[in-house]
Amino acid sequence: MKKTLRKETIAAMKELPQSVKIQADEELTQHLLELPAFQEAKTLATYLSFDHEVSTAGLIQAALQLGKRVCVPRTYPQGRMEFVEYDPDILEKTRFGLLEPNEKGKLVDQSEIDLIHVPGVVFQSKGYRIGYGGGYYDRYLEDFTGKTVSTIYSIQQKEFQPDTFDQAVQEVLVYEVTL
């Protein structure tokens, strides 16, 4: 079921008109920047978005301009992930077509991260999410004590039964897509 929901939702996200996506991305980024959790955070962990996802470029730029420390994920086999300080000069394309920092990046300890901006494909009403199937964020969030937030399009909202290992996102910001 998760596989089908993931596939259908990604297809719908890719169908969003560019004009709608640009508007949605700007509004969601602005909303996130206004959150107390963001304003109070010294260190923000986010991700380098795929084209069909809510763009993180504006968020990263704004956070850096505000003097925040920004980190992005580096993944390893068996679903292990760690965050590395954002530096555009050390980004490399992975086998999944995703940009990630290389080994030269400075690791950021989980205890130093105040807010994690969590990616995902499908979200249900209690904040549980379906990602891309690697379990990276569910494993990482298991012991994370800071705040979590996601930014999504309304077409990503669907009800499903979470698994016992799934970790809920504390706050999900939604842009209501009208086509």
Regions found by a protein language model. Give the residues of each.
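A residue-level signal for conserved active-site and pocket-lining positions in enzyme catalytic cores
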Residues: 9, 46, 70, 117, ...
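Flexible, active-site-proximal loop/turn residues at the rims of small-molecule/cofactor binding pockets
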Residues: 50, 122, 178
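Charged helix-capping and loop-helix junction motifs
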Residues: 61, 130-136
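Anionic-ligand binding patches
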Residues: 84, 118, 122-124
